[in-house]
Amino acid sequence: MAYNHGVRVKEQATSLVAPVTGTAGLQVIIGTAPVNLAADPYKATNVPMTAYSFSEAVEQVGYSDDFKNYTLCQSMDACFRVLNIAPIILINVLDPKKHKKANEEQTVNVEKMQATVKVVGILADTVEVKANEATLTAGTDYITTFDDDGYLVITLTAGGKGASAKTLTVNSTSIDPTAVTESDIIGGYDASTGAETGMELIRHIYPKFSMTPGLLLAPGWTQKSNVGIALAAKCEEINGVFTCECILDIDTAEATKYTDCNDWKNENGYTNKHAALLWPQVKVGTKQYAYSAIFGALTAYTDASNDDVPNLSPSNKLIGITGLCLEDGTEVVLDELQANLLNGQGIITAINDSGWKSWGNNTACYPANTDPKDRWFCCRRFFSWWGNSFILTYKQKVDDNGNYRLIESVVDSENIRGNSYVPSKCAGARIEFSEDENPVTDILNGKIQFHQYLAPYVPAEDILNILEFDPTMLSAALSGGE
């Protein structure tokens, strides 16, 4: 053993653990996309894909302005073009091997060695081209690309068999978004193959990307009660431990007036505390979106602009739209009084108040549930986010010795973390270890329980100023103050 004489130091690992910061408003969006335009159409189905830019999303799943048939494109446009927020996670369920249809034979004219087949959704690998009854070979006699409208463009090669052709005969197969059903969105598990589809892929997000879902969306689908209720159910117990929120739409083909919305909500069972329920649809110029696509992007943008902490309500924020409408395009005009009626029924809407703004703070559980942590959308999200962050931060402590040092480390770290968010992000946050909540029998079974108290700010939804006439002021003014 060494003989020590002098002054020495020794470093020890810090007992306060730095928190792991996730993406608070990470959107997981399920729907359909024009995968025939993707870089690899046959590897874009039922696979979660993360996108940090519009071009990256287009490369992975394709893009079209046909939002009714290709619902993922609503969120792609809303996130990257309307509000500019990233990343997002896309889950396309349109399967080009399953959801497809044979097209009628097309005869197209050739101009300057090119011919455009004006049929949407063509799968390039299914194309058969003939010129003067001669079958042409792809890659040798011609190449295929897609134009900005999604139409197939056939370019003849100078030395190919069809170089002199004036017309081409084209047979092809297209993807068929109308063949996608609610069951495809909800998804399931194939016991024989082990394959998971649709919403079942939500559990893949953390293992694949090391990020926890913040918001679940399926614009264009959640107005269908089977889909909406299933998506709300997926907000809890993700990977057995994580929690998030979802954004749902009311069917504007059925609820055509604001007075129809409450009955529709209750009849369809949209009362989950983890759900924000929206009405009606929105427009940006000529484009028509499910409101959930825009509101999801707005919520994520609000978080990102606030140090990635979801304590702010996305209500009364500019949303970049140009109007409200129903499914058939009929304009909807709401004033604040009508919008407030919807808010009181647990429905979020939008109003034009010197610019179009989101309007509403209550989750779908209101007014049946008035617990502040559940009824206020920002408070509900704050609790989910804090819980997820706690799990991610202290997972490294699992299987360490269950001694006082571990307990002290968690309590000290969490209280320091909580104090760092006061007063800007919350009114208070503290954690305790109580012997009353940790009987010896639990300790012997390896179970340790903490008790944390959180106080996120509730939104200042109703600000009242009482105005009263003061005759003494008038008297003083007229008498010269004497």
Regions found by a protein language model. Name each.
Residues 376-436:
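Acidic, low-complexity glycine/serine/threonine-rich segments
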Residues 2-21, 27-45, 49-52, 68-96, ...:
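A glycine- and small-residue-enriched flexible loop/hinge signal that marks low-structured segments
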Residues 114-119, 149-159, 348-351, 355-366, ...:
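Generic recognition of long tandem-repeat/solenoid scaffolds
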Residues 127-185:
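Surface-exposed interaction regions enriched in Ser/Thr/Asp/Glu
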Residues 107-112, 140-153, 252-254, 270, ...:
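Short, ordered beta-strand-loop transition motifs
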Residues 84-146, 175-177:
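Extended beta-strand solenoid/passenger and fiber regions
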Residues 88, 99-102, 171-190, 426-482:
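Compositionally biased, low-complexity/repeat regions
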